[in-house]
Every structure is written in C-alpha cells, then in structure tokens.
C-alpha cells in the first residue's frame, strides 16, 4: 500500500520536499506519495490532524508552523525539545511524535563538504529559530565553541541562557552583530538578511575558514563576501536535502545517501 506523506506550511508552493522524497523513494524502493499542503494561518492543527485521520504516515512542517507543531506533540525527541520547534511529525500508538531534523541536516551537509567540525569554533549570525535548531547537533558533532551574533544583543543572550541548561557541554557566547571580530573555523548565516536583501557587512577583523549560508537559490551578500575573500563556501541546499533524508529515514527505516542527491 502506498504510504502518504505531506509538507505543510503557508506559503508552501516554493517547497522542494515532494521532489526530494520522491527521489529518495525511487532510490530506496519505498512506495510513497508526498504532497504539498497549504494550511490557513489559523488552521494548522485541524489540517494536520485531518491528514493523520485520513491515514497519513508522516508530515514535514515548515514556516510558520514549527513552534505550533512542537506544542501539539505528545512525544518529542531530545533535539526537538532543545529546538522548541518540530519539522517532522508521525503517529505512533495513537500519539503524535515530533522531531527536528534541521540541525542534523546542517551537520550532514557540512560533513559532506568535508569541512571538519571536531573541536571547531563556530560563529552563527542570527538568533532566531533556525539558530536554536542547529546548536545541539553541531555540539554533538564536535563543535567546541559557538558564538551567536545578533542585531539585538538581548535576543542572542536570551538564547544562550536558554541553551546553557539544555546543552551544558557547549561553550556558548552571545555578541552583537556590530562587534564581529576574531578567528572562526566556520561562519554560518542564519539571518534573514539574505532573504530580504539587507546587506550584512562582515568586517575585515572577522576571520574565518569556511562560510555556510542557510538559505539557498537566492542572491546572498554573505556569500558574495566569502567569495571576495576566497573562502570555501556553500549555500543551504545540502542542509535541505540532509534534513529531508533524516525525516525519510525516521518514517521509512531506510537512509538514502546524501552524496547521491547533491
């Protein structure tokens, strides 16, 4: 019997999840159908519950419903609890289970690039939900110190305070985007600057070996500046594929290889 999956969001037409999951299915021999599902901004819960009531096997959640999905789950993975957001849902024994595969997707993408994560010092630009979701997996993968830089320093400080309890083994620090300096192994752009076109200026006194842009398929002043410095760089398509592979393997018990889809 064909398993039914969906990705839910608003907007949703831009999602590439169906093509990815159908490609994984073809490679692994899983019989599935994966659809986009547009939910009204005030209708996430009813749309999600009706999908599972109709026999849906699993659902991915995208903007702006990840926090709502988190709040509705009966059972959460550790990384979802720390992220306080869920992008992967499934029903088990009548209970709604939730996970967050974004951070693992980023780690898989960085490892596929053969950038070392062990004992690294990482700078993340932005202190929103995207940043919260990747800290724990980065630390698990070996990152030694993570500095979070944000326009509003208080927001970065709040995030560090929240995460210090959840990820006590990590060295976490908050700084203002106006105070960017020092040496880092990897800089990750998790701000919406690349999405909105706001130019983010990286000062000369900020040094880094690699640059990763979480967004993909759009112009990025962050990546332009990495290119000018002749620093190896990548954009977020690998992260998208990586998080999709993680969700696919949770649902179907088989893991496609990331390198086959990059």
UniProtKB/Swiss-Prot annotation:
Protein origin, superkingdom: Bacteria
Amino acids binding NADP(+): 78, 126-130, 150-155, 214, 236
The keyword Repressor appears for this protein: no
Keywords: Amino-acid biosynthesis, Aromatic amino acid biosynthesis, NADP, Oxidoreductase
Pfam families the record matches: SDH_C, Shikimate_DH, Shikimate_dh_N
Catalyzed reaction equations: shikimate + NADP(+) = 3-dehydroshikimate + NADPH + H(+)
SUPFAM superfamilies cross-referenced by the UniProt entry: Aminoacid dehydrogenase-like, N-terminal domain, NAD(P)-binding Rossmann-fold domains
Biological-process GO terms, alphabetical: amino acid biosynthetic process; aromatic amino acid family biosynthetic process; chorismate biosynthetic process; shikimate metabolic process
EC category: oxidoreductase
GO molecular function: NADP binding; shikimate 3-dehydrogenase (NADP+) activity
EC number(s) per entry: 1.1.1.25
Sequence positions that bind shikimate: 15-17, 62, 87, 102, 216
Function recorded in the entry: Involved in the biosynthesis of the chorismate, which leads to the biosynthesis of aromatic amino acids. Catalyzes the reversible NADPH linked reduction of 3-dehydroshikimate (DHSA) to yield shikimate (SA).
Matches recorded under HAMAP family: Shikimate_DH_AroE
Assembly notes: Homodimer.
Identification of the protein by name: Shikimate dehydrogenase (NADP(+))
Name of the gene encoding the protein in the UniProt record: aroE
């Amino acid at each position: 019997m064909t398993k039914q999956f969906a990705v839910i969001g608003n907007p949703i037409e831009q999602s590439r999840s169906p093509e990815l999951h159908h490609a994984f299915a073809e490679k692994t021999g899983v019989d599935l159908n994966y659809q986009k599902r547009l939910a009204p901004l005030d209708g996430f819960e009813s749309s999600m519950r009706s999908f599972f009531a109709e026999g849906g096997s699993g659902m991915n959640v995208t903007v702006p419903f990840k926090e709502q999905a988190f709040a509705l789950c009966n059972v959460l993975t550790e990384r979802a609890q720390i992220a306080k957001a869920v992008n992967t849902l499934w029903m088990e024994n009548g209970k709604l289970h939730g996970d967050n595969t974004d951070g693992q997707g980023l780690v898989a993408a960085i490892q596929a690039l053969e950038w070392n994560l062990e004992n690294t010092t990482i700078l993340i630009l932005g202190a929103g939900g995207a940043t919260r979701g990747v800290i724990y997996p980065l630390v698990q993968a070996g990152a030694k110190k993570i500095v979070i830089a944000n326009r509003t320093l208080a927001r970065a400080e709040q995030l560090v305070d929240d995460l210090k309890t959840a990820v006590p083994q990590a060295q976490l620090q908050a700084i203002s985007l106006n105070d960017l300096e020092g040496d880092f192994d990897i800089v990750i752009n998790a701000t919406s600057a690349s999405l909105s076109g706001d130019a983010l200026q990286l000062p000369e006194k900020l040094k880094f070996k690699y640059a990763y842009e979480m967004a993909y398929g759009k112009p990025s002043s962050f990546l332009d500046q990495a290119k000018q410095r002749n620093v190896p760089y990548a954009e977020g398509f690998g992260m998208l594929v990586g998080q999709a592979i993680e969700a696919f393997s949770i649902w179907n018990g088989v893991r496609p290889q990331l390198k086959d889809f990059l």
